[in-house]
Amino acid sequence: MQEQNPIVLMNFSGIYREEEFWKNRQVSWIELQDVCGTNCYCDEEAIAEINKRTENYPTAGIHFIDSGNYHYMTRLWLTRMDQPFCLLVYDNHTDMQPPAFGGILSCGGWIAAALEELENLKYVILVGPDEAAYEQVDENLKDRVIFLSREKLQVMNDEERNWFLRETVSEVSVSYTHLRAHETS
């Protein structure tokens, strides 16, 4: 494995060239703009190419994965986890929708795919989607999801939020947080 930085920028759309936050830091830059079949959905050929380009980068660290169109990248990174873990996700969406095109990996269904396919993923802590979105999640997945809705967050006081974090996140052995600089919904 080549020498790596703990910050990885995955460049799908070119947006990071316009950003400043990384320019005075040591980062690992993975160029992915030329990979076809990646926008919102990721087909098998694209998965193979992405895995090839990322294979020498560590799973640990901070991975900036471009916009929400590429959230499924977390699913690809998680395949490398060789010990049991739980996943912490802050998002406005559940990302547990059934795939619109067969079994193709998507930005809207990657959490469901991870829960169904990854043996080491024990459960997901999902913070942020609204109650209506969570009601649409497949019942078979809900037993492995700890959910905190946007509505509940708005009415919780500091003590309740701290309790939730102590009781759930304290058990997280590995957590991944989605950082979305350009997505507002």
Which role fits each region the language model picked out?
Residues 1-43:
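N-terminal glycine-rich anion-binding loop in soluble enzyme alpha/beta folds
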Residues 6-8, 61, 86-88, 171:
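Structural motif
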Residues 8-10, 88, 125-127, 146-148:
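Hydrophobic/aromatic beta-strand patches that form the interior of the parallel beta-sheet core
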Residues 16-20, 132-137:
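Short, charged/polar "capping" segments at the starts of alpha-helices
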Residues 31-60, 67:
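Active-site-flanking structural segment that lines cofactor/substrate pockets
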Residues 63-132:
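Active-site histidine-anchored catalytic micro-motif
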Residues 103-116, 131-133, 147-170:
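Active-site glycine-rich loop that binds ribose-phosphate moieties when present
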Residues 177-184:
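Conserved small/polar residues in nucleotide/adenosyl-binding loops
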